[in-house]
Amino acid sequence: MNQTMGGYSPKELTIGTESQEKLLHGIEMISSAVKSTLGPMGQTVIIESPHHTHGLTVTKDGVTVAKSYDMDDPVGNLAVKMMKEASSRTATAAGDGTTTAIVLTEALVKEGMDRITGDINKTDVLRYLASETELLVRD
């Protein structure tokens, strides 16, 4: 039976733990690709790119790697898109730190997921993250 949501019939409905796992997987995948470029010992990445010489782009720039990354799974790709947006905003605002922003976001999300799946009050976790974020931004 296909249920409609506000007149819209979804192709696929993903809820609960399954959606959390898919979102986390998307974050882990883009972070894995990007974090390999981190720091002075970071690795060069080769990206298939029809717009460049011989169809390839060779880069050590995390935001370039992030922008080129996509997933087939629409839920995982939603997380990838959010990470791309965060890295692009970091690049625009600071001019650097895109790879670090993605790696830190992955760590925060993983820690948050560990807390949420435990016996801790989810609202308390969100309040704590909001207060810590405010302190970091202020300092």
What function would you assign to each model-found segment?
Residues 1-139:
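N-terminal glycine-/lysine-enriched basic segments
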